[in-house]
UniProtKB/Swiss-Prot annotation:
It is an enzyme of class 2 (transferase). It comes from the Bacteria. Gene3D superfamilies: Aspartate Aminotransferase, domain 1, Type I PLP-dependent aspartate aminotransferase-like (Major domain). GO terms for biological process: biotin biosynthetic process. Its EC number is 2.3.1.47. Pyridoxal 5'-phosphate binds at G106, Y107, S178, D203, D204, A205, H206, T234, L235, S236, K237. This is 8-amino-7-oxononanoate synthase. Keywords: Biotin biosynthesis, Pyridoxal phosphate, Transferase.
Length: 389
């Protein structure tokens, strides 16, 4: 077995795809200590800076004081605390749905919905750039999976039209795609779902707390909150805690509680995570200026990089991609940024298609204008050195 591991690791190394862990000794703030050195951080999903907010820390500590450090069991045995159900009620109010159910991670939530809802004879229509958890959920279900070209509504319509059978049709898409930060064309997806009698699931991991009124997400951004059957989200990005959730109808929640294996057999979310998430949601709803600052920062950085000659995709989310091309070149650019005191990781296959390795920049509400200008200057400098601009 070890011989096989060595051979496969050698291939990974030769392709420039070796992955290594970095050691952080501070939380994900705009400036961090990584491997013993200070860096500007432009790669965190802590979009609103709530993961290090003192109010969330206080609530997490209070949760531990009252309930302990762990739930002690699954939700269906001994781990269903009153605060679990309070959190679910607050998520449902936040997402404007009848009900919500909490999972231990967004990954488990995606897997749980797709693998339990979709059966043999059903058909899933999945965007080509959907998150790995959606792909794994499709694989675990017994349904047929048809992948449509990324955000290509002509291709989706063609595949819906060509699909026959009496089973359920299920369109699954990220709300905000994690690599490029582009937003799913939800109005057209809703139109096609109605025409072909399909149901819709959105993975709103990167939209929750960012898009829509009060950060409600993608559906609210488009004014389509009543048209979505399942909205999956995470508590670990803009909300600043950890865990995942599904917001849906009351009957669908009850179905997942009884059928989603990733819910039934998971240990319940810890009290500290629950209380931190509740506080994060409250802050998002009551401090809209935090979200506005995030989007303002993202717009500023994107505009300045465009003016510097980088080819940028249009967008308004805090995820900004600089396409470099080859894996080795992307790694070189990232390494040069590290030398300049900036951490922006290179994203390589299999996370993105071959030939599209990139720097994935993520902006936070807590980045200052001085920090934004500094990273712009350093990216411009290295881009010129490498002949990219």
């Amino acid at each position: 077995m070890n011989d096989r591991f060595r051979r496969e690791l050698q291939v990974i190394e030769e392709q420039g795809l070796t992955r290594k862990l970095r050691l952080f000794s501070t939380g994900n703030e705009s400036e961090v200590v990584m491997n013993g050195k200070k860096f500007l951080l432009f790669s965190s999903n802590n979009y609103l800076g709530l993961a290090t907010d003192s109010r969330l820390k206080k609530k997490a500590t209070e949760g531990i004081s009252k309930y302990g450090t762990g739930a002690g069991g699954s939700r269906l045995t001994t781990g269903n605390f009153d605060i679990h159900e309070q959190l679910e009620s607050e998520i449902a109010d936040f997402k404007k749905t009848e009900a919500a159910i909490v999972f231990s991670s967004g990954y488990l939530a995606n897997v749980g919905v797709i693998s339990s809802v979709m059966k043999a004879g059903d058909t899933i229509f999945s965007d080509a750039w959907n998150h790995a958890s959606i792909i794994d959920g499709c694989r675990l279900s017994k349904a047929k999976t048809i992948v449509y070209e990324h955000a290509d509504m002509v291709d989706l319509e063609r595949k819906l039209r060509q699909s026959h059978g009496d089973g359920l049709k299920f369109i699954v898409t990220d709300g905000v795609f994690s690599m490029d930060g582009d937003i799913a064309p939800l109005p057209k997806i809703v139109e096609l779902a109605k025409e072909y009698k399909a149901y819709i699931m959105i993975d709103d991991a990167h939209a929750t707390g960012v898009l829509g009124n009060d950060g409600c997400g993608t559906a609210d951004y488009f004014g389509l909150k009543d048209e979505i059957d399942f909205t999956v989200g995470t508590l670990s990005k803009a909300i600043g805690a950890e865990g995942g959730f599904v917001s849906t109808s009351s009957i669908a929640k009850n179905y997942l509680l009884n059928n989603a294996r990733s819910f039934i057999f998971q240990t319940a979310l810890s009290p500290s995570a629950i209380e931190a998430a509740r506080e994060g949601i409250s802050i998002i709803q009551n401090e809209p200026e935090r979200r506005k600052q995030l989007l303002k920062n993202a717009q500023y950085l994107r505009l300045k990089l465009e003016e510097s000659g980088f080819v940028m995709k249009e967008g308004e989310t805090p995820i900004i991609s600089l396409i470099i091309g080859g894996s080795h070149e992307a790694m070189q650019f990232s390494a040069k940024l590290l030398d300049e005191g900036v951490f922006i990781p290179a994203i390589r296959p299999p996370t993105v298609p071959k030939g599209s390795s990139r720097l994935r920049i993520t902006v936070m509400a807590t980045h200052t204008i001085e920090q934004l200008d500094m990273v712009i200057s350093k990216i411009k400098k290295i881009g010129k050195e490498m002949g990219i601009v």
